[in-house]
A protein has these predicted regions:
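Patatin-like phospholipase
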Residues: 1-187
Length: 187
């Protein structure tokens, strides 16, 4: 809450599936908790001896959560995409497990689309969701999605500015990232 705009992220209890909204404490720990993608990163230790995983397991596009926390404008980017095009691609148990997760999270995310003021849908169908070697392509697809909605983005910015004004960028602002403790990562 010390940030100019309150930051929230979501993780899930690895045993109970309880959604955990990180509202205070270490920003580094909150982010590390929320990116603990199952089968990629180990679960992250959370208070009370619990382990947490990526919040996408329970809420991969938390637009409704943002609204419930008081967000009056929500700009979202849905990066859920079905990558498989045929049954032959279900070549292993791990691919089947990932496809199952994608099917569930994609349906949940799509239900929240109407709640966003502006929604970007980058075309990532041909990029495997865990392929971290294609970051440049992913960023470019994101740029294309934003460019496709340039007029809507400009209209939203105009609406915000007319209602309350935009805050000027302060290039001298120093964040508190360097003050955060280093998280312990399970091996």
């Amino acid at each position: 809450d010390d940030l100019p705009i309150p930051f929230r992220c979501v993780s899930a209890d690895a045993v109970t599936g309880e959604r955990i909204v990180h509202e205070s404490g270490s920003l580094v720990s909150a982010i590390r908790s929320s990116i603990s993608i199952p089968l990629v990163f180990s679960p992250y230790p959370y208070e009370d001896d619990r382990l947490v995983v990526d919040g996408g397991v329970v809420d991969n596009l938390p637009i409704a959560l943002a609204r419930s926390l008081g967000a009056d404008i929500v700009i979202a980017s849905d990066v859920n995409a079905l990558q498989l095009q045929s049954y032959e691609e279900l070549e292993s148990l791990s691919v089947m497990a990932m496809q199952t997760v994608i099917l569930v999270t994609q349906e949940k995310a799509a239900m929240q689309h109407p709640l966003a003021d502006l929604l970007f849908l980058p075309d990532l169908r041909d990029i495997y969701s865990l392929d971290f070697t294609k970051s440049e392509q992913i960023i470019e697809r994101g740029r294309q999605a934003v460019e496709a909605k340039r007029d809507e983005l400009a209209a939203l910015a105009e609406k915000i500015e007319s209602s309350r004004g935009l805050v000027a960028l302060d290039s001298n602002r120093n964040g508190a990232y360097s003050l955060q403790p280093t998280p312990t990562i399970l091996q």
